[in-house]
Amino acid sequence: MYCTRAVSDAVTWVGGNDRRLSLFENLFPIPRGVTYNSYLILDEKTALIDTVDASISRQFLENIMHTLAGRHLDYLVVNHMEPDHCANIEELLLRFPELKVVGNAKTFTLMRQFYDFDLEGRIITVVENDTLSLGAHVSTNKL
């Protein structure tokens, strides 16, 4: 069952909660677990901002599919490659064959080191001040 939250008319939180963890980074107490934030922007084009930890993949994917409501996912924006933010990249590439992954050069260096999937023709490498237009929403890359 999906669990999402509208942030605005066009932005929906599609992340999830992991109540199993008691320590963040095995150091800091988190008595109520941790929340993995991911946002889906629906415009002329669609963009998912980050993914989540593998421990909540099922919930996360249900949230995305529910929010897309049959629409295609155009872009996945990867802000950084920590495992709790990028564990679902491969699954999204499989589910959405036209999906483009947006990130900086280091993102794709790390992605190729961590994963064994083909990114040929599926990446958009951004540099400072590049923009990504989804329609009414435009994202500007600030490094």
Can you describe what each PLM-predicted range is?
Residues 44, 55-102:
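Active-site metal-binding motif and surrounding structural segment of the metallo-beta-lactamase
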Residues 5-9, 103-143:
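Metallo-beta-lactamase
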Residues 23-24, 88-89, 112-113:
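Short glycine-/acidic-enriched loop or helix-start segments at secondary-structure transitions
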